[in-house]
Structures are given as C-alpha cells and as structure tokens.
Amino acid sequence: MKKHIFLSCLSVSLISCGPSSKEAIFYNDGIMGIVNKVTVAQNNFFDQTDGHNIDSLVICQKLYAQKSKESLDEIAKLNAFANKTGYLDAAKVFVNTLNSLANNEAKQMVEIMTKDTSSVTELDIKTVSDLSDKLNKETDEATKLIEDAQQQFVKEWKFELDHNHDKKHYKH
C-alpha cells in the first residue's frame, strides 16, 4: 500500500513539473523551422535584386510570398509553451512582418524592376531604393524581436544554442 501511495505521489509530482528542457528544445526547433523557411526565401529574393536576371527575381518574389504565407499558416497552428506566449508572439510578428513585406514592398520592387529599361525613371530608382531600405529596416526589427524572445526562452528553459555547428546542438 505504501508503495502504491508513493508511486501515485511521484507520478503527480512529475506531471505537475511542466515541460522539460528537451521539450523546450523541440518547441524552439519547430518555431525556428518555420522562421527559417521564410528567411531563406527572403534571402533568395534579396540575392536576385541586383537586376541581372529578371526572371529569377520574379520567381524568387513569388516563392518568398508563398513561403511567407505557408509560414503564417504553420505558426497559427502552434500553441503556447507552458501557457506562455512570448516566444510564439514574437515569431508571429516576425512571420507577419515578412509576409507583409513579401506581398507589398518586394512585389512593388519587382513591378518596377521588370519594367522595360527605357521606361524606368529616376523616381522609380529612388522608389526601389526606399522600398529596399524599408524591407531591410523592418526585417532587422522583426529579427531582433524574435532573437530577443528566443534568448529569453532559452534562458527560462535552461538550454543553450550552439551556433558553432552546421546543425545546432543543445546543451542543457
């Protein structure tokens, strides 16, 4: 009987402990997988903005918009971790920001950059430059927000990100 009571108390105490560091790592990997999908697509778009290959620019902008939409759908399916939403909220802001940039500023840049070169004006060039600056600024702000939230999450759940490897290794 004493053994049964002990095991019951032990199982209740283990259940009430909440998520483990390993579960936090898994959650982090899920969020970062979604974030990285849209980040890679945005970087591919940026790589094509030199104007040398207009077809690639158009394709990369469409892929950027598609990946950002997919990321929005995926991030919307995630739940809070241990009833805390800070990290998830930052990820949602990040993905929403990149989605908006893909469908507005990046799209406007492509519309201008795909014009016949003889019809491109100085105002068009300035507009592309301004749009590019806005893309960079808003991406940097969203990146800082999610990086700060990730660091807080890592600290709270007591694991470390090891950025010295191609694949992240975690210490807990």
Residue locations for each model-derived region?
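Bacterial Sec-dependent N-terminal signal peptides
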Residues: 1-27
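Amphipathic, well-ordered alpha-helical segments in soluble domains
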Residues: 34-41, 64-74, 101-108
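Hydrophobic packing residues in well-ordered alpha-helices of helical domains and bundles
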Residues: 31, 57, 61-64, 68, ...
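Short, solvent-exposed, charged loop/turn and helix-capping segments
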Residues: 71-93, 107-113
